[in-house]
Regions:
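Aromatic (phenylalanine/tyrosine) cluster motif
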Residues: 6-9
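Chalcogenol-based redox active-site neighborhoods
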Residues: 13, 18-184
Length: 184
C-alpha cells in the first residue's frame, strides 16, 4: 500500500454491524472489521474475518497510546504472549491512535502485540465500547475513545468472553480471558 493509498484508507465494517448502543456479549457473532497496523514493511491492513479459523482471537481495546494504564496492560500482555500462543490465541490491541503513533509507542515501550488503528472509532462503536465523552472531569472530552475491554473470539467468529471496563484505570481480568481460552 502506498502512503497516498494509506492516507485515503477508511476503516470498513460489514453491513451486518449490530446496534452500536449495546456492548457485544458472549454468544454474539463478532463484528468484522478491517483496520491498519504499522509493520516494518509499512502500513498493512488487518481484517478480522481473514483471521477467523486460524486461531482464537483476543481483542484488547484501550483508550490511547502513551498513557500509564494502557502501557502497563500491553507491556504485561507482550511479556506473557507465549501463554496466549500456547492457548492457540492471537492477541490484537486496538486504540484510536494513528498507526504511526502506535508504532512509536510499541517501539518505545517494547510492546510486541499487533496494534490496530481504529482512528475513526468505528470498531469501538461496533463493539459497543466507545465513550460518549472520555474523562470530561479531566477536560478530556473526546467522544469515541474506546473503553478498556477484552473480547475472546473463537475460531468460528463467535464471541466467547466479553468484558468492558467503565473506568479507564481498571484492567480486564486476564485470568478469566485465559480460562475462557482453555475451554476452546
Amino acid at each position: 500500500m502506498t502512503l497516498a493509498g494509506f492516507l485515503l484508507y477508511i476503516p470498513s465494517l460489514t453491513p451486518t454491524t449490530p446496534d452500536i448502543t449495546m456492548s457485544i456479549k458472549a454468544g454474539d457473532q463478532a463484528p468484522d472489521f478491517t483496520l491498519v497496523t504499522k509493520t516494518a514493511e509499512g502500513p498493512q491492513l488487518v481484517t478480522l474475518s481473514a483471521l477467523i479459523g486460524k486461531s482464537n482471537i483476543v481483542l484488547l481495546f484501550v483508550p490511547m497510546a502513551f498513557t500509564g494504564t494502557c502501557t502497563i496492560e500491553f507491556c504485561e500482555i507482550s511479556a506473557g504472549l507465549a501463554d496466549y500462543r500456547t492457548l492457540d490465541a492471537t492477541v490484537l490491541g486496538i486504540s484510536g491512535d494513528n498507526p504511526f503513533a502506535q508504532a512509536a509507542w510499541a517501539e518505545k515501550e517494547g510492546i510486541t502485540i499487533p496494534l490496530l488503528s481504529d482512528y475513526e472509532h468505528q470498531v469501538a462503536k461496533a463493539y459497543g465500547v466507545a465513550y460518549d465523552r472520555f474523562l470530561p472531569e479531566a477536560n478530556l472530552i473526546m467522544g469515541g475513545v474506546a473503553k478498556r475491554s477484552a473480547f475472546v473470539i473463537d475460531k468460528t467468529g463467535v464471541v466467547r468472553y466479553a468484558e468492558v471496563q467503565e473506568h479507564p484505570k481498571d484492567l480486564p481480568d486476564f485470568e478469566a480471558v485465559k480460562a475462557c481460552l482453555r475451554t476452546l
